[in-house]
């Protein structure tokens, strides 16, 4: 759940940045209404229960209502949606409007089977992409902590040039406070 909350809180901070752009023709205080965060979990048995607890704390997941079979047919996935008003930081502390967090529209897709990453991408583009018809899609792996303005800069690349079909951001290792993580050979 720490990796999930790290990523999700980073996304929430980015949405707050979009909403802080009061002089923008596109964004502004209600900019959060133009953004939908889709979280796709690859297999009900594979997702960590504490990650589900974090999603429940955000209001987007309800434990105990998902069924394997409905009307004698196997269920492929469970879809939950909610507009959350709070975020959970890496320390599992709630952050809300008092810390600059704005509402966030969320869709949580809990796949029954673990069918790997490409199948999750297929779900995102074929199911949610077709329904939402977004102008820009940004894919993040769990554990990635986007800088507070990173998603805005990715969006801006598409907005400024209609010929841009893809963009990538820079990934930097988290060095930790006082660069303590550099003592870990996997980070350094």
Curated annotation (Swiss-Prot):
Q: Where in the cell is it found?
A: Cell membrane
- Any GO BP: cell wall organization
Q: What is its EC number?
A: 2.4.1.16
Topology in membrane: Multi-pass membrane protein
Cellular component annotations (GO), alphabetically ordered: cell septum; plasma membrane
Q: Name one GO molecular function term.
A: chitin synthase activity
Q: What keywords would UniProt list here? A: Cell membrane, Cell wall biogenesis/degradation, Glycosyltransferase, Membrane, Transferase, Transmembrane
- Keyword Transmembrane listed? The answer is yes
Q: List the catalytic activities from the record.
A: [(1->4)-N-acetyl-beta-D-glucosaminyl](n) + UDP-N-acetyl-alpha-D-glucosamine = [(1->4)-N-acetyl-beta-D-glucosaminyl](n+1) + UDP + H(+)
Q: Which residues form a coiled coil?
A: none
Family membership, please give it. Answer: Belongs to the chitin synthase family.
Known function: Polymerizes chitin, a structural polymer of the cell wall and septum, by transferring the sugar moiety of UDP-GlcNAc to the non-reducing end of the growing chitin polymer.
UniProt cross-references to PANTHER family, sorted A to Z: CHITIN SYNTHASE (PTHR22914), CHITIN SYNTHASE 2 (PTHR22914:SF38)
Q: What is this protein called?
A: Chitin synthase 2
């Amino acid at each position: 759940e720490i990796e999930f909350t790290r990523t999700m809180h980073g996304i929430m901070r980015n949405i707050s940045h979009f909403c802080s752009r009061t002089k923008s023709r596109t964004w502004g205080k209600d900019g959060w209404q133009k953004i939908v965060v889709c979280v796709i979990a690859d297999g009900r048995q594979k997702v960590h229960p504490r990650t589900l607890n974090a999603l429940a704390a955000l209001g987007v997941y309800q434990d105990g209502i998902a069924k394997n079979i409905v009307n004698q047919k196997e269920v492929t996935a469970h879809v939950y949606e909610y507009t959350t008003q709070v975020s959970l930081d890496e320390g599992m502390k709630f952050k809300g409007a008092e810390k600059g967090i704005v509402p966030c529209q969320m869709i949580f897709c809990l796949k029954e089977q673990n069918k790997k990453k490409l199948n999750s991408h297929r779900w995102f583009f074929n199911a949610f992409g077709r329904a939402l018809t977004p102008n820009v899609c940004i894919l993040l792996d769990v554990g990635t902590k986007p800088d507070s303005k990173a998603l805005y800069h990715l969006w801006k690349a598409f907005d400024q040039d209609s010929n841009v079909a893809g963009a990538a951001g820079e990934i930097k290792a988290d060095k930790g406070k006082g660069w303590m993580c550099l003592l870990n050979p996997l980070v350094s």
